[in-house]
A protein has these predicted regions:
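Membrane-helix boundary/helix-loop-helix interface segments in multi-pass membrane proteins
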Residues: 2-44, 50-227, 392-407, 411-420, ...
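Hydrophobic, glycine- and aromatic-enriched re-entrant/interface helices and adjoining loop segments
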Residues: 151-159, 163-166, 253-350, 369-376
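Hydrophobic alpha-helical segments of polytopic membrane proteins
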Residues: 210-270, 282-283
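Interfacial segments of multi-pass membrane proteins
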Residues: 234-253, 321-346, 403-417
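Loop-to-helix entry and N-terminal half of a specific, functionally important transmembrane alpha helix
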Residues: 362-403, 409
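Long, low-complexity, intrinsically disordered segments
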Residues: 467-510
Length: 510
């Protein structure tokens, strides 16, 4: 056990060292010095990571140990690239402190994760508050529409703000809706698994079971219509369909979900101008008409592609590229910043780290026996995998841009805090999945066996007494001679409660 813990803390310290080296290299090349405020905050962040690891070892000792080091490297790399753009902005007279703010958000996320580890010993507690989670999730999702606090940024009304500070409540809404989806599908899995008629070789669900998926589909479209947020609406719908498949095991739900998705996507591209503009930029990225558009064109996308090409195989090196040429290179397009300064090799490492987190969550979902935990783990990990796929796919022209950001890397405190909580929830569920089953001791087995034997003996005596109650006096005398307890009965006799007397346990029955 000690060797295992040394290996785990060694992995965490190595990931922290990699993050610090990346920071130091970037500052040395881009600024020529390492600012003291960044150094102090980095030390605090490292201490919080170690403290979180200690809490996990105490309260969740069997949890997955590959998730936390992966988050350390991803978040460190993201903050390094964000700070790189801050340094360039300072040189041109437009100073920003997005990287420093992101470090503060990371510290806050680690504190909240530590509290979650201490307070939430058993994830099954979340099932008791399924409908409360639904209400909280919907309130968070619709809160940007409230007058006075709602903010529209980049054409999407998904922010709430107080003064100069903004928050994206939809990032937290996905967690609460995942709790509700998991509890609802676990309670209704039998009804949803019942099949109807076959179509194209698949047994389709009954018509009356279409209600949940239609409701979630309509809510997703409402998010798209009201908030102009394509990525969030797709994420909620995809999360529900994936959890529905896990709950029922029927591929027909995947087919039905895909049909609903295609219908919604085509209708949205024809009705909503901002969705149609993204589709046009995806289909014709290099056309002069699309590239020259002031808003909604392909200029950002094309610059990101050239940034990836400039990185080559090994990249220009941290602090030596020009990622600021691509708009939003510190948030939506931070993946292109990685490709430019670390090259294809760096991109593959980043994808491998995400794969480690996703694989850990999938293994947890397969291993855990509790149905609610299986659904919750699969829903959370699919949400993260879907985000990574849509961001990478949008930048590389596989799919249109959706507006989602890379977890742990992109600028944005709401996303960072929510995804850190998501990762800790996966660790808590994995602790339950990996915890060894308690062994039955010999004393416990002896107690249960003797209790069963005593119950059988008592029932036999009762039956014999009933059968002999109507016999003559000779039979009664004979029964009286043989009904008394024998020496063997006295040795194995148990009290009425079925417990073994203490003297027998200690003295071997003497």
């Amino acid at each position: 056990m000690i060797i295992t813990r040394l290996r785990r803390i060694g992995l965490l310290l190595f990931s922290l060292l990699v993050g610090f080296i990346g920071f130091f290299q970037m500052f040395a090349r881009a600024a020529g010095r390492f600012p003291g405020d960044y150094a102090a905050l980095l030390v605090v962040t490292a201490a919080l990571f170690i403290a979180l690891w200690v809490l996990l070892e105490i309260f969740q000792p069997y949890g997955s140990q590959a998730i936390l080091p992966s988050i350390v490297i991803l978040s460190s790399l993201g903050i390094t690239l964000i700070t790189r753009i801050d340094l360039r902005n300072a040189r041109i007279g437009q100073p920003t402190r997005v990287g420093f703010t992101q470090l503060i958000w990371l510290c806050l996320a680690l504190v909240l994760c530590g509290l979650l580890v201490v307070l939430l010993r058993d994830y099954r507690l979340l099932r008791r508050f399924s409908y409360v989670s639904m209400v909280v999730g919907l309130v968070l999702l619709l809160s940007p529409m409230l007058p006075g606090i709602g903010r529209e940024i980049g054409g999407a009304r998904i922010w709430i703000g107080v003064g100069s500070h903004t928050l994206q409540p939809g990032e937290f809404a996905k967690l609460f809706l995942a709790f509700f989806f998991a509890a609802y599908l676990f309670d209704h899995r039998d009804q949803l698994a019942v099949g109807g008629k076959k179509f194209l070789g698949m047994r389709m669900p009954r018509i009356k079971d279409f209600g949940p998926i239609i409701i979630v589909w309509l809510i997703s479209l409402a998010v798209l219509v009201i908030q102009h947020d394509l990525g969030t609406s797709l994420m909620y719908f995809a999360m529900f369909v994936s959890m529905l498949y896990v709950a029922t095991g029927r591929t027909s739900w995947i087919a039905i979900g895909s049909i609903f998705f295609v219908i919604g996507a085509v209708a949205a591209s024809m009705i909503f101008a901002h969705v149609g503009a993204r589709v046009d930029a995806w289909l014709h990225p290099f056309s002069d008409a699309e590239f020259g558009k002031a808003f909604g064109g392909s200029g950002q996308l094309v610059r990101g592609i050239f940034g990836l090409a400039a990185g080559g195989l090994t990249g220009t090196g941290l602090g030596q590229g020009r990622p600021w040429i691509t708009p939003l290179a510190n948030s939506d397009f931070i993946y292109t910043s990685v490709g430019e300064e670390l090259g294809l090799s760096g991109l593959l490492v980043v994808l491998a780290l995400y794969l480690v987190i996703v694989a850990s969550g999938m293994i947890t979902a397969m291993k855990i026996k509790d149905g609610f935990g299986k659904l919750l783990a699969s829903g959370l990990v699919f949400t993260m995998a879907f985000q990574v796929f849509t961001v990478v796919g949008g930048i590389t022209l596989v799919i249109p841009l959706t507006g989602l950001t890379m977890p742990y890397m992109a600028a944005g405190g709401s996303s960072l805090v929510a995804n850190c909580i998501l990762a800790v929830l996966l660790i808590i569920i994995s602790n339950a999945a990996n915890k060894p089953a308690p062994e039955v001791s010999s004393d416990t087995f002896k107690y249960e066996a003797l209790a069963v034997l005593r119950q059988q003996e008592t029932s036999k005596r009762s039956g014999q007494d009933d059968s002999d109650s109507g016999s003559g006096s000779d039979d009664q005398e004979s029964h009286g001679r043989h009904a008394g307890p024998t020496d063997q009965d006295e040795e194995t006799d148990l009290p009425a409660t079925g417990r073994i007397p203490a003297r027998q346990v200690r003295g071997g029955g003497q």
